[in-house]
């Protein structure tokens, strides 16, 4: 608190302490404490009681009461009298003093602002306002549309949801753009409480300018009926194109693709080309890449029915497959690897499907957003609890029982692509508790050739961002340089979903036109899997070898994949306040649980020995700083669990 200056250093120091704690834990109260701290620091008046602080910006009953409790504790500890609660007269005097202090202004008038020429309003492409105007342009001059119908018509034109907030901790949706349109008098509102909407004359003028801005000559009315969502993805933010719905399960789906993909090679850029005759289409986003997916339209307009839009649900869990693959013996060299005849799946006998983890959600109150948006883009996800990763792709046999007859389980084969999606706040949390390192380690042990990390932008406190920026940059660099994984950065969850859909279409192009070779499950063990896969890739780099989904689930099951080191670290992290970073440092000193128990045992069980046990971990890690350091309280807690107190 010594560094806190101002007229109220005691109160200022406590608020600063709470602000620092809120920033450290990335809580929502951090901006509130920051506002209160800056307000109190700038105030020249001295306050006697915390309740008087409510005349300042940022101070409410909660902070004032917390300061009162802290002041009471401070007075009791130091033998000081507790200040009395101020009277109303004192509060009025403070308000007058603050008003007088804020009324002092520079007598010199500010320089006159230069007049700006107002530009004609044209909403941003694919914004909420753009989508609403496009949907309303389908109406005739005297027709109106209710909110439910309007949202359904407008959603295909917008890259943001009209019902779900763009950011999990914000309330803004694309529908909030309606307020802007009403303020600019571009939309008529009729009827209460059942509201109906229509374009004003000015609204029609804006639609006309939108048309001119896109260099299109076709009329506005009815244009949305010939449009659909297409998939777009690039190195930066991309805009969705519009075309007709394409059902990937149809034999003649209208999907034209350039067959220039190299096998097992995931390229970061996937672009979309729209037909030139389609009216009111946004210009497609093109990426600097020779790889592209061209999605064109049929003469007809195929539509998904409601059943096609629903995700595929699988009830079988990975726990059912834990004992499927045996542990086996170690493999000292290639001569100990098994010889086998691979199972061959002919082209056309399977379809490529996206598997989405059931825990992968946008927000707790909207758990189905990702699968619903994928379904709108023509990708029916298979919903399943995944032990590893958030998204992966499988080849699903069209003929049930085919794999069983040939020596593998189930009807699904895991392809060599897996995705780990992390928002910035989740990335920071996983770095702090050690999950980030553990996940990368388990991905490496999975044998997957193509690992993609999607790092999704998120609105976090700027102080938290600055505090962990170096850690985030280091983590993202290690993903690419150290581990050799592909890193995809997106700005919104909508962009992440479009990217996943684009990858799905690309993998369909890569795999569905060639045979798949599957390793029989009976030759696999947990010890020979990685050496076998490595040997096959070196021996036949042009041919991929895959395993069934049940075998993969058994191999990556957390209970089978964890080493003694992993188990020990997880055991340590069960202790309250013991983070992943601290657990890793403890494991570096005592390699196994046995060594830690023996270290406590060596301290002795008498009174002097118990004192040594309480400070054992703290003394051994005293050279560490910051978050890796173990204080006395945590050291005693560890001794309570592992020692002989």
From Swiss-Prot:
Q: Which InterPro entries match?
A: DNA_pol_lamdba_lyase_dom_sf, EME1/EME2_C, ERCC4_domain, Mus81, Restrct_endonuc-II-like, WH-like_DNA-bd_sf, WH_MUS81, XPF_nuclease_Mus81
Coiled-coil spans are none
Q: Domain of life, per the record? A: Eukaryota
Stretches of Acidic residues bias are at 296-305
This entry's Enzyme Commission designation comes to 3.1.22.-
Q: Which GO BP terms, alphabetically? A: DNA catabolic process; double-strand break repair via break-induced replication; mitotic DNA replication checkpoint signaling; mitotic intra-S DNA damage checkpoint signaling; replication fork processing; resolution of meiotic recombination intermediates
User: Which residue ranges does the record annotate as region Disordered?
Assistant: 98-119, 219-310
Supply the SMART domains for this chain. ERCC4
Q: Name one Pfam family in it.
A: MUS81-like_WH
Keyword Phosphoprotein assigned: no
Q: Where is the composition biased (Polar residues)?
A: 223-252
Key words, A-Z: DNA damage, DNA recombination, DNA repair, Endonuclease, Hydrolase, Magnesium, Meiosis, Metal-binding, Nuclease, Nucleus
Domain ERCC4 per the UniProt entry, residue ranges: 353-459
* Cellular compartment(s): Nucleus
Cofactor list: Mg(2+)
Keyword DNA damage recorded: yes
What's in the GO CC field?
A: Holliday junction resolvase complex; nucleus
| UniProt GO molecular function | 3'-flap endonuclease activity; crossover junction DNA endonuclease activity; DNA binding; metal ion binding
Job description of the protein = Interacts with eme-1 to form a DNA structure-specific endonuclease with substrate preference for branched DNA structures with a 5'-end at the branch nick. Typical substrates include 3'-flap structures, D-loops, replication forks and nicked Holliday junctions. May be required in mitosis for the processing of stalled or collapsed replication fork intermediates. May be required in meiosis for the repair of meiosis-specific double strand breaks subsequent to single-end invasion (SEI).
Concerning its family, UniProt says: Belongs to the XPF family.
State whether it acts alone or in a complex, and with which partners, per the record. Answer: Interacts with eme-1.
The name of this protein is Crossover junction endonuclease mus-81
């Amino acid at each position: 608190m010594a560094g806190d200056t101002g007229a109220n250093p005691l109160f200022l120091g406590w608020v600063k302490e709470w602000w620092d704690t809120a920033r450290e834990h990335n809580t929502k109260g951090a901006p509130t404490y920051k506002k209160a701290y800056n307000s109190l620091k700038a105030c020249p008046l001295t306050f006697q009681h915390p309740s008087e602080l409510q005349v300042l910006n940022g101070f409410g009953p909660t902070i004032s009461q917390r300061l009162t409790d802290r002041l009471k504790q401070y007075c009791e500890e130091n033998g000081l009298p507790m200040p009395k609660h101020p009277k109303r007269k004192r509060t009025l005097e403070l308000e007058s003093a603050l008003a007088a202090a804020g009324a002092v202004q520079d007598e010199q008038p500010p320089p006159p602002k230069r007049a700006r020429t107002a530009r004609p309003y044209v909403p941003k492409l694919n914004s909420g306002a753009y989508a609403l105007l496009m949907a309303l342009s389908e109406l005739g001059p005297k027709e109106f549309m209710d909110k439910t119908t309007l949202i359904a018509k407008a959603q295909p034109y917008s890259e943001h949801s009209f019902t779900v907030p763009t950011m999990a901790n914000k309330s803004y949706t694309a529908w909030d753009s309606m307020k802007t349109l009403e303020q600019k008098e571009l939309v008529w509102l009729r009827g209460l409480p059942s509201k109906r909407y229509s374009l004003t004359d000015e609204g029609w003028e804006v639609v006309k300018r939108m048309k001119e801005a896109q260099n299109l000559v076709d009329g506005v009315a009815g244009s949305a009926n010939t449009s659909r969502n297409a998939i777009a993805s690039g190195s930066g933010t991309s805009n969705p194109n519009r075309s007709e719905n394409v059902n990937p399960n149809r034999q003649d789906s209208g999907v034209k693709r350039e067959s220039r993909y190299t096998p097992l090679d995931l390229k970061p850029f996937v672009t979309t080309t729209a037909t030139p005759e389609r009216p009111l289409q946004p210009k497609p986003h093109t990426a600097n890449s020779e790889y592209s997916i061209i999605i064109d339209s049929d003469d007809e307009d195929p539509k998904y029915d409601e059943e096609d839009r629903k995700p595929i649900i699988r009830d079988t869990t990975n726990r059912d497959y834990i004992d499927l693959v045996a542990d086996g013996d170690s493999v000292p060299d290639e001569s100990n690897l098994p010889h086998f005849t691979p199972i061959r799946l002919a082209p056309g006998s399977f379809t490529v499907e996206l598997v989405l983890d059931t825990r992968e959600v946008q927000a707790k109150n909207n758990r189905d957003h990702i699968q619903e948006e994928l379904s709108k883009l023509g990708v029916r996800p298979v919903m399943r609890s995944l032990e590893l990763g958030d998204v992966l792709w499988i080849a699903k046999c069209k003929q049930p029982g085919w794999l069983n007859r040939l020596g593998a389980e189930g009807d699904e084969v895991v392809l060599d692509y897996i995705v780990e999606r992390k928002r910035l706040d989740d990335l920071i949390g996983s770095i702090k508790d050690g999950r980030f390192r553990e996940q990368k380690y388990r991905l490496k042990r999975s044998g997957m050739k193509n690992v993609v990390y999607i790092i999704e932008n998120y609105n976090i406190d700027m102080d938290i961002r600055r505090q962990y920026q170096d850690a985030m940059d280091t983590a993202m660099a290690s993903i690419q340089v150290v581990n050799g994984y592909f890193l995809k950065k997106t700005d919104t969850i909508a962009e992440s979903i479009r990217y996943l859909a684009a990858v799905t279409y690309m993998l369909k192009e890569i795999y569905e036109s060639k045979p798949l070779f599957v390793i029989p499950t009976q030759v696999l063990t947990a010890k020979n899997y990685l050496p076998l896969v490595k040997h096959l890739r070196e021996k036949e780099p042009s041919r991929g070898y895959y395993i069934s989904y049940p075998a993969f689930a058994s191999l990556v099951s957390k209970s089978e994949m964890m080493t003694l080191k992993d188990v020990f670290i997880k055991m340590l992290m069960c202790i309250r306040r013991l983070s992943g970073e601290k657990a890793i440092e403890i494991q570096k000193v005592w390699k196994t649980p046995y060594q830690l128990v023996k270290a406590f045992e060596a301290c002795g069980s008498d009174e002097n020995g118990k004192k040594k046990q309480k400070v054992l971990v703290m003394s051994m890690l005293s050279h560490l700083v910051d978050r890796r350091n173990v204080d006395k309280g945590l050291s005693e807690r560890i001794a309570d669990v592992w020692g002989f107190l």
